[in-house]
Amino acid sequence: MADTHTQRPRPVALLILDGYGQNDDTEYNAVYSARTPVMDALKQRYPSTLLHTDGKYVGLPDGQMGNSEVGHMNLGAGRIVYQDFTRITKAIEDNELASNPVLTAPIDAAVAAGRAVHLLGLLSPGGVHSHEDHILAVAALAAERGAKHVYLHAFLDGRDTAPKSARASLERANARLAELFGADNAYVASIVGRYYAMDRDNRWDRVEQAYRVIVEGEGSQVATSAEAGLDAAYERGETDEFVAATSIRPHGEPVRMADGDAALFLNFRADRARELTRAFVEDDFSGFTRQARPKLAHEGLVMLTEYAADIPAPVAFPPTDLVNTLGETVAKRGLKQLRIAETEKYAHVTFFFSGGREDEFEGEHRELIPSPQDVKTYDEKPEMSAYELTDKLVAAIDAGTYDLIVCNYANGDMVGHSGNFDAAVKAIEAVDDCLGRVIEAIERAGGECLVTADHGNAEQMVHPETGNPQTAHTTFQVPLIYVTPRQGATLADDGSLCDLAPTLLTMMHEPVPEEMTGRVLIGNT
């Protein structure tokens, strides 16, 4: 195949049918139940296969369902993009924490000064904002570095976990700390519900209660142990999420942060860690009056990941810089690209598909179609803005301006989240209707395209075990169809989302950059 711009198909398109998975169980399967003559015909006429979108295939823990952010990041990167949860877990498994100077420097400084180490975070196995395994791994790191006094300030979950499930985590943490340092030298020194410690709506009165119990050892409640404090909270009618700030005082005196102490915030998700972090590190902080603000060891409070670019605190696991994503590669080759979606998925075909880049690349155009504003939930309008999007997309194809087009149809996912089976069927049918027009335009232009999804959703609308509506994503594979006029074209099986960027470049007769470790899935018989 000659590598010339004149001979390649134009445009090459990636059509992402969000939330459109393949489930062999046909019951409460909106994808199966919908009338989809276009998809049915495409599968008959063109090469097709299934793709993995979950767990290790997209940089998540095994078995973890994919999501739109992760899916589009992998689609655009052309390599598995390890998510923060997985990156940190892998660093622990590979014994790499000890070689991370952002973690070791403040601990070493505190040890040298004879000061304490404080660990802050959501003590939970939920895996959404944090994981207790990460917290206990850093405690073990502190022990290896010679720390004598380590205090854990535990935020309680009850939201990504059962409402009253914190006891097991507290008992496990105290047992491990006692094993590492001795029970008198290390323990859970405060507990507070995430409602207070992890606010994200500038409710500073809540954050202040968490800050004061961590820094000053002053809470509205006092207990001799974390477990006793939790029992008292339950007796007050509080669940884990709402546990009042409780100072734990096994020896009668509170734990207070002091100058020279080390402090590490061990949540990995940013949005609910920002406010408390700002209270620790910002000189001009105005959320509430800080009665105490100790000068912490080394460069101050450590963030496990970057909670915000403007927070002046060291980051143990900074954002990965994705070089030569599909969008960047196409731009470097002097080609034109279109990203198009309705509001609900606009960030996914732009920011996430570009590897976390806000700005357009050279030669990139973005088309935003507003999602419906006249309904509370999209099951009231399952077609959403698919027809308006299709009008714009077909016009763009007919204009012949673009070499690469990336489009997302949001319906299967957004209506799937409603749990409304009948509406999800209508959503899938609307997408199929639109898909027919788009494929006709691509064929008319002499182009090629891949039709796929970022993850499943609408193919399982009722949970098979509980019988309740299922509103979450699934771990089912998703279809991949290669629409091409080439005779004898094939698609390899057992692919993942990261394989599509190198595949698209190959369709465009463009070389694949070495950073893209995904496989090219197209071939010939």
UniProtKB/Swiss-Prot annotation:
Alphabetical UniProt keywords: Glycolysis, Isomerase, Manganese, Metal-binding
Name of the protein described by the UniProt record: 2,3-bisphosphoglycerate-independent phosphoglycerate mutase
Pathway as given in its UniProt record: Carbohydrate degradation; glycolysis; pyruvate from D-glyceraldehyde 3-phosphate: step 3/5
Catalytic residues, chain numbering: S68
Function as written in the Swiss-Prot or TrEMBL entry: Catalyzes the interconversion of 2-phosphoglycerate and 3-phosphoglycerate.
Keyword DNA-binding: no
Organism, scientific name: Chromohalobacter salexigens (strain ATCC BAA-138 / DSM 3043 / CIP 106854 / NCIMB 13768 / 1H11)
Keyword Metal-binding attached: yes
Free-text comment on the cofactor: Binds 2 manganese ions per subunit.
Subunit structure as annotated in this protein's UniProt entry: Monomer.
Catalytic activity: (2R)-2-phosphoglycerate = (2R)-3-phosphoglycerate
NCBIfam families in UniProt: pgm_bpd_ind
Ligand binding (Mn(2+) 2): D18, S68, D454, H455
GO cellular component term, pick one: cytosol
Family membership noted in the UniProt record: Belongs to the BPG-independent phosphoglycerate mutase family.
InterPro entries associated with the record: Alkaline_phosphatase_core_sf (IPR017850), BPG-indep_PGM_N (IPR011258), Metalloenzyme (IPR006124), PGAM_B_sf (IPR036646), Pgm_bpd_ind (IPR005995)
Example of a GO MF term: manganese ion binding
Family annotation (SUPFAM superfamilies): 2,3-Bisphosphoglycerate-independent phosphoglycerate mutase, substrate-binding domain, Alkaline phosphatase-like
Superkingdom of the source species: Bacteria
Residues reported to bind substrate: H129, R159, D160, R194, R200, R269, A270, D271, R272, K345
Positions contributing to Mn(2+) 1 binding: D413, H417, H473
EC numbers: 5.4.2.12
Required co-factors: Mn(2+)
GO biological process: glucose catabolic process; glycolytic process
